[in-house]
UniProtKB/Swiss-Prot annotation:
Subunit structure: Heterotrimer of A, B and C subunits.
Membrane-crossing residue ranges in chain numbering: none
Gene source species: Opitutus terrae (strain DSM 11246 / JCM 15787 / PB90-1)
Name listed for the protein in its UniProt record: Aspartyl/glutamyl-tRNA(Asn/Gln) amidotransferase subunit B
Nucleotide-binding in keyword set: yes
Matching HAMAP family: GatB
Catalyses which reaction(s): L-glutamyl-tRNA(Gln) + L-glutamine + ATP + H2O = L-glutaminyl-tRNA(Gln) + L-glutamate + ADP + phosphate + H(+); L-aspartyl-tRNA(Asn) + L-glutamine + ATP + H2O = L-asparaginyl-tRNA(Asn) + L-glutamate + ADP + phosphate + 2 H(+)
GO process terms (BP): glutaminyl-tRNAGln biosynthesis via transamidation; translation
Keyword match Nucleotide-binding: yes
Keywords: ATP-binding, Ligase, Nucleotide-binding, Protein biosynthesis
Domain of life: Bacteria
Length: 485
């Protein structure tokens, strides 16, 4: 019997705000333990929560970016449980009236090759709700220490429908969702800092069956790669249990990304175990059209939309768009460069950024914002090549020095004597005549309509010119002489 996997993901995203969800104490990471706290965070008697409007703005933006329905009214609920990471013994969350409903995350599955676009599909969402984060437990040899710095930080929970059917789809979903949150300025989504955390609910069922199988929740998925690997492992584990005639038990399992194994933690709790009820200290939130319209004006173009536009507007190939669009700063850098160099030079600009700029940045380990090469540098380099002032090989050398020094291409070319030498027109024409005379086959192919056959003559001409001839003049001269034959 053939089986299919059914996967739903619960993704927690820390919202990037200056202060916490229900108090004005600062939100942050990397501070000394328990220094980002106050009476509200520590749940001291008599304290009352006050909503953070910036966090509400952020979740509305997330909902708009993902095509959710923004509820006109949402409310706050208390999720009751006892654990040391929650001083109140409950978490303020949203239960039956979340702020965002529906929506979808567009994903791209791997193509047949790295330079081939894969299938696109949309993974539907159930909801997005806002809550407060909890503290962090640090387990030592004999003690467990509690750090409440994270407690109270605004946290979005993004819940997908059980519509993911493979580990690769889950990987693509998280990659796309993370990029959306970063593009929107909603979160930095640094998994090492706990800014993006994911739990996976996984079950298997016979192909064609509509009823869901018994689900297992997988936790401790500390990277997007671990999510993919953990899901693949859990699918194999469940299939092995079924093949042995066993029964899948509803439980929570801990995945160890280092060993590629998982172990049972506990039986899965049901929602009613938390005894949700409305928080009496917080009023419902009313989201009117004016509020949504204001947030809509701040929503950026998302990666896949930008990828489609780059192809339509600039005719960029997938090999370039698949790199450029996933970093908003990089795609903005590209468009700023194209604005200076000209839209007709977009592919050339893209090649310099993807192949040369990213290589130098990776080698130097500096962020793009700190790179000395700015859009104007690359635009000037492209114009110098196009004018025949410098040749491509020289431009490669110039780029490396330009990255190291921040000097303009023209200054470097003058300083190092890398400008193309002026070529005597009579001498160039003779070199072209000699190349044409020596290759009758290429002449016949060119005359028969094979335009690329002209390249067979360029090598001998450049060799005769010792690499200093202007490629544009070489091409023009060859075409003129061939047309006259």
């Amino acid at each position: 019997m053939n089986y299919e996997a059914v996967i739903g993901l619960e993704v927690h995203v820390q919202v990037k705000t200056a202060s916490k969800m229900f108090t004005r104490v600062a939100a942050g990471y990397g501070h000394a333990p328990n220094t980002l706290t106050d009476p509200v965070v520590l749940a001291l008697p008599g304290t009352l929560p006050v909503m953070n409007k910036a966090a509400l703005d952020a979740i509305i933006k997330a909902g708009l970016l993902l095509g959710c329905e923004i509820a006109p009214v949402c409310k706050w609920d208390r999720k009751n449980y006892f654990y040391p990471d929650s001083p109140k013994n409950y978490q303020i969350s949203q239960y039956d009236q979340p702020i965002c409903l529906g929506g979808a995350v567009e994903i791209e599955l791997p193509g047949s090759a790295r330079n081939v676009m894969g299938e696109h599909k949309k993974i539907p969402l159930t909801r997005i709700h806002l809550e407060e984060d909890v503290g962090k437990l640090n387990h030592e040899s004999v003690d467990s220490l509690v750090d409440y710095n994270r407690a109270g930080t605004p946290l979005m929970e993004i819940v997908s429908e059980p519509a993911i059917h493979s580990a690769e789809e889950a990987f693509a979903y998280l990659t796309s969702l993370r990029a959306t949150m970063i593009y929107g300025g909603i979160s930095d989504c640094d998994m090492e800092k706990g800014q993006l955390r994911c739990d996976a609910n996984i079950s298997v069922r016979p192909v064609g069956e509509t009823k869901l199988g018994t689900k297992v929740e997988l936790k401790n998925l500390n990277s997007i790669s671990f999510v993919r690997d953990g899901i693949a492992h859990e699918i194999k584990r469940q299939l092995a249990v079924i093949e042995r005639g066993g029964t899948i038990v509803q439980e929570t399992r801990d995945y160890d990304g280092q060993t590629g194994t998982s172990q049972s933690l506990r039986s899965k709790e049901m929602a009613h175990d938390y005894r949700y009820f409305p928080d009496p200290d917080l009023m419902p939130v009313v989201v009117d059209q004016a509020w949504k319209a204001r947030i809509q004006t701040t929503c950026p173009e998302l990666p896949f939309d930008k990828q489609r536009r780059f192809f339509e507007q600039y005719r960029l190939p997938y090999t370039l768009t698949s790199v450029l669009v996933w970093d908003r700063e990089l795609s903005d850098y590209f468009e700023e460069t194209v604005k200076i160099a000209g839209a007709d030079k977009a592919q050339t600009v893209g090649n310099w950024i993807v192949n040369d700029l990213l290589r130098e940045i990776g080698t130097a380990r500096v962020p793009l914002a700190d790179a000395k090469v700015r859009p104007a540098h690359i635009a000037e380099l492209v114009k110098l090549i196009d004018a025949g002032t410098i040749l491509t090989n020289a431009a490669k050398e110039i780029f490396v020095e330009m990255f190291a020094t921040g000097d303009t291409p023209a200054i470097i070319a003058d300083r190092r004597g890398l400008k193309a030498a002026p070529t005597d027109s009579n001498e160039l024409e003779q070199w072209c005549r000699d190349a044409i005379a020596a290759n009758a086959k290429a002449v016949a192919e060119f005359k028969a309509g094979k335009d690329s056959a002209i390249n067979a003559f360029k090598g001998p001409v450049m060799k005769a010119a010792k690499g200093k001839a202007n490629p544009k003049l070489v091409d023009e001269t060859l075409r003129r002489l061939l047309a006259a034959l």
